[in-house]
Amino acid sequence: MLKSLSLVAAVLVASHLEEAQTDTTASIVLDGSSISASIANAAISSLRLTDINQEKLRENAPGRTFPEMIRNVPGVYSTSETGSFGDAKINIRGFKQENISVLLNGIPISGLTSGSMYWNNWMGLSDATAAIQVQKGVGNSMLSDNSVGGTVNILTTHPSDAFRAEAGWYHTGAGANNAFINVSSGALPRGWNLSLMAAYNWGHTFVDCSRISSGSYLVTLDKTFRQGHKLNFTALGSPETHQQRSVRLSYEEVGKYGAAYNKSWGWQTAEDGSRFQRTTARNQYFKPYFTLTHSYDGGRSDDGGNGWKAFNTFYLAFANGGGYYSESSGSRISSFIFPEGTEGAGQIDWDAVIAHNAATAPDANGIRAVNVMTDYLAGHVQAGLKSNAVKEFGDRADIDFGLHWQIYDTWEKERITDLLGADYWFEDYEKKSLAGLAGRNPVKGVGDYVRTYNGRRQNYFTAYALAHCKAGRKRQLVFTLGASLSATTLRRWDLYNYSEAEKWSDRASRAGGSVKGGVLYRLGRFSKIYANAAYYSRVPYSSVFFSNGNNQISRDICNESNSLAELGYRLAGGSFGAEITAYAALWKNKSLFSSPYSTIEEDPVKYMVKGLDAFHYGFEADLWWSYEKFVRIDAFASVGDWRWKNDVSATIYDPTTLQPMGTVNVYADGLHVGDAPQTQLGASLRFALSPGLDVHADWTWNDRFWADFDPVTRTDPDDREDPYRIPSYHLLNAGVSWSGHIRKLGLVLFLNVNNILDSSYIERGKDGSTHASDSFTGYWADGRNLNFGLRLVL
């Protein structure tokens, strides 16, 4: 059934408060963007759902990355990772981004190369998001076959029916700023409707040398025709540049320099004798994203309509950007550090880097560089078509069947930007390129390309069918069953390792599929039980097909398989609600890559480990109580047990001939999965002191938190120790907001204080060789910090 976004928002809230008797489980569609958004309604859904409306998103947004707006959700761990603007990670039920599906208005936006999600490329979403639904475990969309941990479904704002304009600004104590303006035309003559949003971020985060310059925009244009037809156009983008903290810290370094320490920058002396900051880590990216959608609603068959709905969306994105990088043939830039006791201690001494480069004895071409600065450039063109139709059979059943095709064309290359006092860089094609010298000049200067020039072209196709059926006199039993088939073909091109005539690889292809289903039974007016399960035979990401860094297709590629199951109880009364869920997920035949410089019998090789299994299970609980509009209390708990389940042997192949070179054993059985806390507790309180004046606070505790690690590094049969266990920590945040009117102008003022207790804690980290604090490295979070701002509404 077609719903406007205002109704979507109402469903998101009301589904936890009352029994909705109408079926909105089948694709709820944005009225503004007219996209089948695969939003589920908790009143009738057999999935574990968390809905975050725009008010809550705005409360969480200031100074935070996009994933951090999904806070206080059991089983979800989202952090800023490095402390740099936009750099973020999210884990759901212990699974990383590769096992989390991200949908934008129902369209998958996770990368096809590795499943990764570069959140800084989507920072504009913070100001353009109307609601987020987190669907843990089995996702509601048949296009989310990587929804093992769960699905994050993002809904963007849309034009309102009446004219509306708002503007806002916030500032963080660390020095970050955001300003935005949002205008909606309201209904225009002949069925048109337009909304515009623009925003700008500037300043810096709490991390040293972390300047920000990021814009964002969203344009939405609707056209309503007669007889149930609509067209919608959206344009979304976020051109950004930000300095990064790209190197993790040790306990010793944090003790010396503090949690804001950033090893990626230093000081350089200018020609006039002044000193200026210079960094090795900066990212710039821009990904304009466009959609054009046609939707049709023929009306319900029991209301005189034909019972058909159809949605066709074409989308297109052009991505272009990159980041600072460096190449070295000796002592790397990071080894030139100001010593203790001097000004700038712990930071890069750029003058020493340049002096070391210039000290090399010149040859016929001049001074040969030991280090050079480069830009590592990457981009892609992404285009696709999503088409589905829904046939309703009264209020008892419906079937949704559809197709999705996507082409993903990528490229990456590296360009010299600074010779650092030398005259040239020697690109050793004889050793580095499979093609050898091949008539190329190894003497390189500023603007020349080195080391990398390749890309991939991938086609991905999915066909699916999804049915919902209600049974019983009061429709108290709801069944869901869906199946999908998927296939991919891909080729890789490489102009560094091959000639123009031989640049394309052979074609690689795989097929997969999924089956998912669920059942919900209403026990009474306020309570229900539900269960769901799924099985995925998932085509590996394209990085698995070309794991050797050249055009040789990896041998013996197999699909990953995922088996999921969940059982839950949901209670929703007028002022009280609760939900308890038990889940299990088995991930089989995971493929992982070793470091490119692992040494087997003194030969540097890279190997792929296949057949690793992991088992995640646990339970989650939510409770809430409210008294009219004056008080609301929420509490949650999540306890999991996530472990790797087997030891495996990996065959090492020659990277060019693919002939076997030997084997290596990996011992991971029983080790805890790292990178997210396996125990979480939390509570929040909201209290209305007076009309328009609200106070809120939230507390979270994270424990049983093991550091991230690569199972492929566990090649010692006697090394069975768990990765380093990061100390548990708790956070207390609070805020106050006031809303009112000055004449006809709406005004909202807010102030938030995060980490009130000034806790020192680690957000993310990597295990070391001793599995103890002496070899651990990670990212420490900010201490006590605040943000404040205002919003004006006309």
Q: Across the structure, where does each feature detected by a protein language model lie?
A:
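Structural signature of Gram-negative outer-membrane beta-barrels, strongest in the C-terminal barrel
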Residues: 380, 392, 396-398, 404-408, ...
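N-terminal periplasmic "start-of-domain" segments of outer-membrane beta-barrel proteins
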Residues: 26-61, 89
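Conserved C-terminal beta-signal and adjacent last beta-strands/turns
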Residues: 236-237, 276, 287, 531, ...
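Short strand-turn segments of transmembrane beta-barrel domains in outer membranes
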Residues: 138-141, 151-187, 198-208
